[in-house]
A protein has these predicted regions:
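A short glycine-rich, Lys/Arg-flanked "PGG" loop and its adjoining helix->strand segment in the class I
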Residues: 116-128
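Conserved class I S-adenosyl-L-methionine
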Residues: 1-35, 133-157
């Protein structure tokens, strides 16, 4: 995946625009509406060139980005991230537990091999009641042909709940068009369930 995105880095934003890709606007907006005007720290997972945090920066939130592709990160560093960390999202993240009010992850789930592990890691980084906005690719032959992950709601819902999240909202929307084929996303807003004194 890193090799693919390193090659795309220079033209990535323009190509998404040409594909009429809007998930990078819709999912962050869900998080912004939930957080309101209070000061907040946000984790941008798979931040890429920073598109998924453009609306978030406008609100003045502190944003930490994580991405595995150096070429993408070089572009993201031009934006007002508080911190950017280069690492694989399926490795333990080098950020403190229970230190973020929200997380966003757009256009990443199709590459994640172990979604349950990733969801639990997100949960550990959020404060109690923290929110997680993300896209989940809706089951499609387009993804299967490319050896990427995609899901029906009934497949991903138990994974989400088992990881310790409640589903606040989910909406099926057009993600993009590929060779004339419409590819859909499920846009989710999740909330971390409250911890108890006996368990994390």
């Amino acid at each position: 995946m890193n090799a693919v995105y390193s090659h795309l880095a220079k033209t990535y934003d323009r190509e998404l625009h040409d594909m009429q890709y809007t998930a990078y606007l819709k999912v962050p907006q869900l998080v912004i509406e939930e957080l309101g005007h209070r000061q907040a720290s946000i984790l941008d997972l798979g931040c890429g060139t920073g598109l998924s945090s453009l609306l978030i920066f406008e609100k003045g939130y502190d944003v930490t980005g994580i991405d595995g592709t150096s070429a993408m990160i070089r572009r993201a560093r031009k934006l007002p991230y508080k911190k950017i960390i280069q690492q694989d999202l399926e490795s333990p993240w080098r950020v403190r537990d229970h230190s973020f009010n929200a997380a966003v992850m757009v256009g990443v789930m199709e590459y994640i091999i172990y979604p349950g592990v990733l969801f639990r890691q997100v949960r550990n980084k959020l404060v109690d009641g923290g929110v997680f906005g993300l896209t989940v690719p809706y089951k499609s032959k387009c993804y299967e042909d490319a050896n990427l992950k995609s899901y029906y709601r009934k497949e991903i819902t138990p994974v989400i709940r088992k990881a310790g999240f409640n589903i606040e909202s989910s909406e099926k929307t057009l993600g993009f068009e590929d060779a004339g084929q419409k590819v859909a996303y499920l846009n989710y807003l999740l909330r971390k369930r409250q911890t108890t004194s006996s368990s994390d």
